[in-house]
């Protein structure tokens, strides 16, 4: 079960870092209509 806990922690950390960078520096992608 420890492997599952370590995997969950790893995914959570990566997700937090990704969202932090995403919100701090919005991606400069070409707008294809929509929002």
Swiss-Prot record:
<comment type="subunit">
    <text>PSII is composed of 1 copy each of membrane proteins PsbA, PsbB, PsbC, PsbD, PsbE, PsbF, PsbH, PsbI, PsbJ, PsbK, PsbL, PsbM, PsbT, PsbY, PsbZ, Psb30/Ycf12, at least 3 peripheral proteins of the oxygen-evolving complex and a large number of cofactors. It forms dimeric complexes.</text>
</comment>
<protein>
    <recommendedName>
        <fullName>Photosystem II reaction center protein T</fullName>
    </recommendedName>
</protein>
<keyword id="KW-0793">Thylakoid</keyword>
<dbReference type="InterPro" id="IPR001743">
    <property type="entry name" value="PSII_PsbT"/>
</dbReference>
<keyword id="KW-1133">Transmembrane helix</keyword>
<keyword id="KW-0604">Photosystem II</keyword>
<keyword id="KW-0150">Chloroplast</keyword>
<keyword id="KW-0812">Transmembrane</keyword>
<comment type="similarity">
    <text>Belongs to the PsbT family.</text>
</comment>
<feature type="transmembrane region" description="Helical">
    <location>
        <begin position="3"/>
        <end position="23"/>
    </location>
</feature>
<dbReference type="InterPro" id="IPR037268">
    <property type="entry name" value="PSII_PsbT_sf"/>
</dbReference>
<dbReference type="GO" id="GO:0009535">
    <property type="term" value="C:chloroplast thylakoid membrane"/>
</dbReference>
<comment type="function">
    <text>Found at the monomer-monomer interface of the photosystem II (PS II) dimer, plays a role in assembly and dimerization of PSII. PSII is a light-driven water plastoquinone oxidoreductase, using light energy to abstract electrons from H(2)O, generating a proton gradient subsequently used for ATP formation.</text>
</comment>
<dbReference type="Pfam" id="PF01405">
    <property type="entry name" value="PsbT"/>
</dbReference>
<dbReference type="GO" id="GO:0015979">
    <property type="term" value="P:photosynthesis"/>
</dbReference>
<keyword id="KW-0602">Photosynthesis</keyword>
<dbReference type="GO" id="GO:0009539">
    <property type="term" value="C:photosystem II reaction center"/>
</dbReference>
<keyword id="KW-0934">Plastid</keyword>
<keyword id="KW-0472">Membrane</keyword>
């Amino acid at each position: 079960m420890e492997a599952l806990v370590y995997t969950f922690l790893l995914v959570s950390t990566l997700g937090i870092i990704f969202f932090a960078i995403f919100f701090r520096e919005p991606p400069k992608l070409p707008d294809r209509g929509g929002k």
